[in-house]
Amino acid sequence: MTLLNDFFFILLQEPSPNLVKAKITINEHHKIFEGHFPGIPVVPGVCMVQIILEIMEAVIRKPVRLTESDTIKFLTVMSPKENKEIDVSIDYTAERGRFLINASLFSGSVIFFKLNGVLTID
């Protein structure tokens, strides 16, 4: 299931060699929030991971899959009602069809999510 342009939207994207910076917004009325949680939307952790994957796919123009993860940390609840714009940072190194990534979702000094892992071209 693709989340881009339905669950989340890219407001600004600044790719440069080995670094992607983006600003996104989450659709607080998306059907995912009917169950997570009604009236109090909280972005599911799996959606945070998928946001990183889809932004990388948009940058490299190829489908990727998370094949290894050293660290996945969900540090703060991310609410689309309270956090209208979310910053995304993906530091990556290409290595033989794989991408070593260090990614985070944050707003100001509040870090919601961190991921260190390996993406493989699908």
Report each predicted region and the residues it spans:
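Hydrophobic beta-strand-centered segment that forms part of the acyl-chain substrate-binding groove
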Residues: 53-92, 98-99
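HotDog/MaoC-like acyl-thioester-processing domains
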Residues: 15-18, 91-122
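Compact, glycine-rich, soluble single-domain proteins
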Residues: 39-44, 48-49, 53
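Catalytic strand-loop segment that frames the active site of acyl-thioester-processing enzymes
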Residues: 2-43
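Residues that act as N-cap/strand-start positions at coil-to-secondary-structure junctions
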Residues: 6, 84-86, 111-113
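A broad structural signal for short, well-ordered beta-strand segments within beta-sheet-rich domains
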Residues: 8-11, 63-69, 112
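Long, contiguous binding/interaction regions
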Residues: 2-3, 72, 118
